[in-house]
Every structure is written in structure tokens, then in C-alpha cells.
């Protein structure tokens, strides 16, 4: 059996999967935010409860909103303050007396999609989460690419390309990012960026769902804005498609539910690519909120 944990700032979700990726048991608990020992105990108790439910000792994979850094496995994860700077993998492996694997939750999302029955044949899968920020990951031949520092999928912290300024104006504010830099693309093409850009251009703060409703209703400002946003999205994604040349691009997060993306984006991307480049298949994520635990379980299952 394969155990996948999706650890968030407010909840920890555990999904138990068999070798065919069928979910056989699940449980959700609140995330201890202050005390590391309490967090460890919560995870250990969940694993032992799952063992009792399925009658075997499962293999443990964990997706976290952050990265594992350095040689001692210390975590860099602002959303899990109890685990910040702690060697969670080492400590949990010691307590459980079994191998524990940890990866970024966005990598787990992409891994889950890459192992979907419909998508499994694609050698290179690029995934983007257009949510509050812009997360993502790259899976090649069924395995996530982590990089030297574990930040290979932090696409949101690439800077705005020069042709983006032709679309949204050279005087666009270089928004200060949480990473400490300015002009990171997640502040412009994420769900939050979608709303910020609209307010910047039209002086009116509206939620994304309202802007999209106005767009579908034919409202002129919303139509103009979405047209420019799609050009901006294509300009930013064009660099990623040229860099990684994926067979499949999977989109997740709240903005991925704007279904018009899948009709408009393929018409805007070709001019951003090399003339010989063929577009990848572009799809909405198949597994939604369940992708986190599924991908975490795959951190072990992918070796089979």
C-alpha cells in the first residue's frame, strides 16, 4: 500500500492507494501549526491508523508547500511554521522505521497528472497551478525533476518577458514578490494577478469570477481585458514551452476552471514559439484537489 500526505497550512490529508492507484482509505485532520513534536506525532498516528485499516505497513510519501533544502533535509515552508527548518523526512523515517519521501506539493500535483491513464504515454509533462500564486512542476518519463536546490518548478519566480511589456505597458508596476524580487510572473498571470491587473487597468477591484461572468456576458471592458490577459499568458508560457518542449501542458488552480483558456490559448501561443514548434496538448487537470495525495503516494509507486 502507498500512503500519500497532502500537508497544508490548515489541514493534513492522507490518502491510501493500492498498486493500481485506487484509493482505499482516507482521513483529514487539522495541521498543528506551533509545535514540531505535535506535528510529528500527528503524522505518526495517522500512519499507524492507516496500517491498522489496511493490515500492512504502507510506504509514505508527503507533499509540502515548500522545499527540502540542504544535506540535512531541513524544510523551507512558510505555510507550515511548525516544520520550518526541521528535518521532517529524517525524523519521521526514524520514528516509523521506514522510508519516507517528501516533495513539493506542486510537483506532486504534476506527478499525479502525468500518471493519469490518459496522459501516461506523454514523456514530458509540464504542469502549472494558476491559483493564488503560480506553482508548477516538470515530470520526465514519469519522474519529477527537482533540480539541485529543489526549486526546478518554481516558474512563478521567472521575470516578466520583454514582450509582456508590449501587452500590459512598459509602465506596469514591478510588483514586489514574496520571494524578495520584483516583476515575478506569478504576480501577473496567477488568479490573484488576474484580479490585480484588472484593477490596475480599470481602477475597479473585482473578483475573477465576476470578471469572467462579465466577459461571458459580452461586457466591453471585460472582453478587452481577457483578450490582453490571454496575450500576456501566452507570452509568459511561450518561454516555458520553448525551454522544456513538453508533450502535454496541464493546468490546475482556480483560473484553470476558466474553460475559454483551452480555446483561446492555442491560438495565441504559436507566435511565441519557434516556427518549427508544435503546440503541446493543453488540458485541465483531471484529479483536482485529490491530485496532492495521489501524487505524494506516487513518490514511491513510481518506482514500480
Curated annotation (Swiss-Prot):
Catalytic activity annotation: N-acetyl-D-glucosamine + ATP = N-acetyl-D-glucosamine 6-phosphate + ADP + H(+)
Transmembrane segment boundaries: none
Residues of the signal peptide: none
Involved pathway(s): Cell wall biogenesis; peptidoglycan recycling
Keywords: ATP-binding, Carbohydrate metabolism, Kinase, Metal-binding, Nucleotide-binding, Transferase, Zinc
Protein EC: 2.7.1.59
Any one GO molecular function term: zinc ion binding
GO biological process: N-acetylglucosamine metabolic process; peptidoglycan turnover
Top-level enzyme category: transferase
Binding site for ATP: 4-11, 133-140
Classification via SUPFAM superfamilies: Actin-like ATPase domain (SSF53067)
Residue numbers binding Zn(2+): 157, 177, 179, 184
Gene3D superfamilies in the cross-refs: 3.30.420.40
Biological function: Catalyzes the phosphorylation of N-acetyl-D-glucosamine (GlcNAc) derived from cell-wall degradation, yielding GlcNAc-6-P.
Family: Belongs to the ROK (NagC/XylR) family. NagK subfamily.
Protein name as annotated: N-acetyl-D-glucosamine kinase
Record organism: Pectobacterium carotovorum subsp. carotovorum (strain PC1)
Gene field: nagK
